[in-house]
């Protein structure tokens, strides 16, 4: 049940973070930064919950769990410090890296959730 809730939180927070980030990036929602950061933290927290939770299932993967932890740390770190990284003409590179990490966060979380559901399907 916890993985199912975390998966729903990941979907909702991840999608809203993606939309608010693109709005912020395009200059539309400059006041959405705090909301975007909160949604990103929720998405990463859900990723970590799913990653660690699926690792303890019968056919869980500790590689997925470790990848979830590393990806979450990278996503948060790049998000928090991106305004001071590659300042100038190449700043778009950091923005694309952060966007890519966010999309990977959603994808890896759902991959872990599906793995968990498949491993526990017979025990219901």
Set out the residue ranges of the language-model regions:
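Polytopic transmembrane helical bundles with strong interfacial aromatic enrichment
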Residues: 1-124
